[in-house]
Amino acid sequence: MSGSETGLMAATRESMQFTMALHQQQQHSQAQPQQSQNRPLSFGGDDGTALYKQPMRSVSPPQQYQPNSAGENSVLNMNLPGGESGGMTGTGSEPVKKRRGRPRKYGPDSGEMSLGLNPGAPSFTVSQPSSGGDGGEKKRGRPPGSSSKRLKLQALGSTGIGFTPHVLTVLAGEDVSSKIMALTHNGPRAVCVLSANGAISNVTLRQSATSGGTVTYEGRFEILSLSGSFHLLENNGQRSRTGGLSVSLSSPDGNVLGGSVAGLLIAASPVQIVVGSFLPDGEKEPKQHVGQMGLSSPVLPRVAPTQVLMTPSSPQSRGTMSESSCGGGHGSPIHQSTGGPYNNTINMPWK
């Protein structure tokens, strides 16, 4: 066999091998079209056989999921391979389409498509209304704590309304006690004494240590303090007055005496008294008496400053003021009596 024939046979053999290789390649590409696109074709070898170069895959480490503090509004930022993502993105946008055809000659060796979220993509935030707001709806019923305030006031006792101050002037020779009690004749108002100033010439005090229970002093005494109250009570249609006065007096020599007033309290000079009247809780003042309280008071008869109480059980006596209300020694009470017109001041019948 000549050399030309040998070369022709070798060329024919190589062309047949190349044709068979191309035929096998076409069958393999039809079975796996997707893989053939991602595999670059290169011609190598001594006989010109087509070879397929396996692309290098760059395996990226899986990104850890980090929950967002926003709850349901959190957005997942993950890089998924192109073959596993299915063309979906985390933001709900349109799927990314793959390019068909032969890959670029000078493109990257990796055949994966990296799908990631745009870091600058806007995230949607849903604001939830606060649970504490009621939409401005007004609640019905009694506000909390109002009932407890009423219970606290009831524990302090009954309350009065319509407090009105009065300034009374008692002339010399008039009874201070009668002047104060005259305010209660105009209606169901209670009276309380706040202060007083002036001089007293005759006073009868209640002292249980003495034999008679009361003692009367004559002279000139300055009022240090005067307090007390008078309140009207109605029981079975009958009205009665309860209350009384307490006084503290100072003599010219500096001695102090005082106690509960059990008789007359005669003024030695004009006495100014500040009192207050009010309506007790649960009582109403008649309309015809509104505004008439304190405008006028009955004129009381004058009593001589030197008058001493006369009682059936004890004779009249005169003397100087005692240093002690209990008597005995150098200074003894000038007059003691077992009874008098003011001994029942705590509960007097209504006129």
UniProtKB/Swiss-Prot annotation:
InterPro entries: AHL, AT_hook_DNA-bd_motif, PPC_dom
Biased composition regions of type Polar residues, renumbered to the chain: 60-77, 310-325, 334-351
SMART domains membership: AT_hook
Main location: nucleus
SUPFAM superfamilies for this protein: AF0104/ALDC/Ptd012-like
Region described as Disordered: spans on this chain: 1-151, 310-351
Disulfide-bonded cysteines: none
Residue window of motif Bipartite nuclear localization signal: 97-105
Domain-related comment: The PPC domain mediates interactions between AHL proteins.
Name used for this protein in its record: AT-hook motif nuclear-localized protein 10
Organism: Arabidopsis thaliana (Mouse-ear cress)
Encoding gene (name): AHL10
